[in-house]
From Swiss-Prot:
Its EC number is 4.6.1.-. Mg(2+) binds at E25, D27, D85. The active site is at H5, H41 (nucleophile). Dermonecrotic toxins cleave the phosphodiester linkage between the phosphate and headgroup of certain phospholipids (sphingolipid and lysolipid substrates), forming an alcohol (often choline) and a cyclic phosphate. This toxin acts on sphingomyelin (SM). It may also act on ceramide phosphoethanolamine (CPE), lysophosphatidylcholine (LPC) and lysophosphatidylethanolamine (LPE), but not on lysophosphatidylserine (LPS), and lysophosphatidylglycerol (LPG). It acts by transphosphatidylation, releasing exclusively cyclic phosphate products as second products. This is Dermonecrotic toxin SdSicTox-betaIIB1bvi. One of its GO terms (cellular component) is extracellular region. It comes from Sicarius cf. damarensis (strain GJB-2008). GO terms for biological process: killing of cells of another organism; lipid catabolic process. It comes from the Eukaryota.
Length: 274
C-alpha cells in the first residue's frame, strides 16, 4: 500500500492518485463539541508541504464516495484504502465518544449512504493515542445502534502515536478488537527516525498467534534510501508525500519481484504470507 500523505483538499485526491498512490490519508479536525468539521492538518506539518489545505468533511466524503464507486465518472480503480487521521487531541477527552459517534454517522450518511452507496474503499481509523480509545468504542456502538454493524468488516484500527506496542495491545483487548489492526511507525519527514520500534512491530506481526497487528507501515517517507530500508525490513505499506518516488523504488531490481501494488482484491486485514 502506498499511502498519499495529508491529502486534505478535494483537488489533491487526483493529484496523489496520479502520482501512484493506491491509498490516501486525510486529517479530520474537530470542533470543541466533538463534531468533525473539516479535513485539515494545520501548522506545523511536514517540511516542504503546505499545511493549510482543507475541505468541508462531508463534502470531502461525498467526493471520495464518487472516486471509489465503480461506474461513477470520477471512479479511480486504484484507490482502495482511506486512512482517516483523526485529531481528537484537539478536543477534551470527554468529547472523544461524541467524536466517534459523529464520524460514524457522517460516514453512514455521506460515504456508505446507509446501504445505498456502492463505494467500496476500506476505511482505516488512525487514532493518535491509546487514551482516545473511547472514539473507537463510540464508532462501533454507533454502527450497531444505527443497524449497520456489517460495515465493521470494512473498518480497521491503527494507533499512530508511536506508543508502547504492549500498551496498544492492552487497549485493543479492552475494546475486544482481535483483528483488522494496522500499526504505524514513523515521524514527520523533517526528522530522521530509527528502526527499533518498526522492527518490533514487524516481529509481532509475524509471530504465530499474535492477533493485534495485521499490517505495518512506515511514515512519512520522502527519501528513497529510507523507503528502501523500510522495504527491506518487510513493511506492508509506506506513507509518503511523494508516491511517485515509492513507485520508482518498487521497480528497482531488488524489489520488483518481491513487492507489488495492492489492489481491491487484496484484503487489508489479512497478513500477507509470501
Amino acid at each position: 500500500w502506498i499511502m498519499g500523505h495529508m491529502v486534505n483538499a478535494i483537488e489533491q485526491v487526483d493529484e496523489f492518485l496520479n502520482l501512484g498512490a493506491n491509498a490516501i490519508e486525510f486529517d479530520i479536525d474537530f470542533g470543541k463539541d466533538g463534531i468533525a468539521q473539516i479535513t485539515h492538518h494545520g501548522i506545523p506539518c511536514d517540511c516542504g508541504r503546505k499545511c493549510t489545505k482543507k475541505a468541508i468533511f462531508t463534502e470531502y466524503l461525498d467526493n471520495i464516495r464518487q472516486v471509489t464507486t465503480p461506474d461513477d465518472p470520477k471512479f479511480r480503480e486504484q484507490l482502495v484504502l482511506l486512512a482517516l487521521d483523526l485529531k481528537p487531541q484537539r478536543i477534551s477527552s470527554a468529547k472523544a465518544y461524541r467524536a466517534g459517534e459523529d464520524v460514524a454517522k457522517k460516514l453512514l450518511d455521506h460515504y456508505w449512504q446507509r446501504g445505498n452507496s456502492r463505494a467500496r474503499a476500506y476505511i482505516l481509523l488512525n487514532i493518535p493515542l491509546v487514551e482516545d480509545y473511547e472514539f473507537i468504542r463510540a464508532f462501533k456502538d454507533t454502527l450497531r445502534n444505527e443497524g449497520y454493524e456489517s460495515y465493521n468488516d470494512k473498518v480497521g484500527i491503527n494507533f499512530t502515536g508511536n506508543e508502547d506496542l504492549d500498551k496498544i495491545r492492552d487497549v485493543l483487548e479492552i475494546l475486544g478488537i482481535l483483528k483488522q489492526v494496522w500499526q504505524a511507525d514513523g515521524i514527520t519527514s523533517c526528522f530522521a527516525r530509527g528502526t527499533e520500534r518498526l522492527k518490533e512491530a514487524l516481529e509481532k506481526r509475524d509471530t504465530p498467534g499474535y492477533n493485534y497487528i495485521n499490517k505495518v507501515y512506515a511514515w512519512t517517507l520522502v527519501r528513497k534510501s529510507i523507503m528502501r530500508r523500510s522495504l527491506r525490513l518487510g513493511v506492508d505499506g509506506v506513507m509518503s508525500n511523494n508516491p511517485d518516488r515509492v513507485i520508482k523504488v518498487l521497480k528497482e531490481k531488488e524489489f520488483a519481484d518481491k513487492f507489488r501494488l495492492a489492489t481491491y482484491n487484496d484484503n487489508p486485514w489479512e497478513r500477507f504470507r509470501g
